[in-house]
């Protein structure tokens, strides 16, 4: 299983994880999710030969693609972090 962060320039960064993916039902729903949820779309993605659901979060200068089950946080310094849900270990920080 991977999270793929797609820059507008076309660079791919893969983060390997054994966890299934991004969940809508985060409680409480963070403010940043409300702000960007109108600019998202759901799509099917092939990962290691298996079709899975993914969510594209469209940012000003790129796309953050996350699988249901991960937590994603956006911070005041315009960075985005992707966390594993079981221990909130930060997998990756993306500066936007």
Residue ranges and their predicted role:
Residues 2-59:
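N-terminal non-globular leader segments, chiefly Sec-dependent signal peptides
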Residues 61-96:
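Short, compact, well-ordered microdomains
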């Amino acid at each position: 299983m991977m999270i793929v962060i797609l820059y507008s320039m076309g660079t791919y960064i893969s983060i390997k994880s054994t966890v299934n993916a991004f969940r809508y039902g985060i409680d409480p729903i963070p403010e940043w999710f409300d702000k960007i949820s109108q600019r998202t779309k759901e799509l099917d993605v092939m990962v290691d030969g298996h079709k899975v659901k993914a969510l594209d979060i469209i940012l000003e200068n790129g796309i953050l693609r996350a699988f249901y089950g991960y937590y994603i946080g956006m911070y005041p310094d315009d960075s985005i972090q992707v966390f594993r849900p079981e221990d909130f270990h930060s997998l990756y920080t993306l500066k936007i």
